[in-house]
């Protein structure tokens, strides 16, 4: 019986361990998808705010509305971690804010971008993809990029239609989105 249980445990370990390696890092020439507008399925810009596509799920519409609430906020290192509603946001604070507002994160507080490596599931989503690596995290939501910049100018959360390089990032998503 002990041999059987040992063999069973080893088999389970061998089957589940490869799943830990399914998450792959994007290659050097990788970039976010180019923005292409598709009626009903792609968000678009009106000024500095995003307009959700008509066919987007309710949570995606909530996420876009949440992003619009903070696009005017400046970049602030550590912003959005101590308080959900803050005067400035860094990358993980802004991503955490919109995901919580959309009901996609629960009460979990992600204090660093690196912690998003375990959020959701590996791979690209249909409506939402999280790009994450140590030191930075951003989203692509219904075709628009929601991103911050920690440069000296301190650009806080913003929506972008332009692609960006993403070598070294991992991609994550919520199943169904």
What does each model-identified segment do?
Residues 7-16:
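Bacterial N-terminal signal peptides
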Residues 68-88:
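Active-site nucleophile-His-acid catalytic modules used for acyl/amide transfer and hydrolysis
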